[in-house]
Amino acid sequence: TKEERHLALYRKYRPQEFKDVLGQENALKTLENSIKQNKISHAYIFSGDRGTGKTTVARIFAKEIGSSRDDIFELDAASNNGVEDMRILIENTQASTFGSKYKIYILDEAHMLSKSSFNALLKTLEEPPANVIFILATTDRHKIPATIISRCQEINFISPSIKILEENILRISKKESRKIDNDSVNLIAKQGKGSFRDSLG
């Protein structure tokens, strides 16, 4: 389907390093500084509209602080939002790493967690294991309890401008050896409505 094709294109060209990420200078600067200064938080909230690069940047951040693939866990909170799911995840945090300094837990759509899940997570955030980092990615920050927010460092992701989306479309069409005129690039960027993912449709 068209949806599958554009998702495949998005995944194929998903940034692998900070320098490949477009339009999130403030977010990247904060994260890069925390790595340089060795001031890494135990919990982060990455908030912003869909398709702005939250999960992508979370993965890059995990890699940049030296976590191996075996120590990076991604959970879709929309479909794993029960307290039992959270208990299993928290139990998992107690296990030692596979040789990395940190175990990273990326919770996508974190605002979808149930109240009891948030309560279970809160206890862990109050006394976090030394080698565990949580990254809560959300499009709905206001649905996350204030008690959770207060224990996380917040990183805001902004929707990319039309110009940045155009730049990304041109870069990818060049790599795909496809010629595309400027009017089409502009139209595609506008239809993307501030989302890198949607602008590759």
Could you tell me what each predicted segment is?
Residues 55, 193-194:
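Short secondary-structure transition/capping segments
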Residues 105, 170, 174, 185-191, ...:
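C-terminal helical "lid" of AAA+/P-loop NTPase domains
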Residues 1-154, 160-164, 172, 182:
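P-loop/Walker A NTP-binding region and its immediately flanking N-terminal helices
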Residues 156-157, 189:
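A ubiquitous short alpha-helical element
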Residues 177:
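Extended polybasic, low-complexity segments that bind anionic RNA or targeting/receptor surfaces
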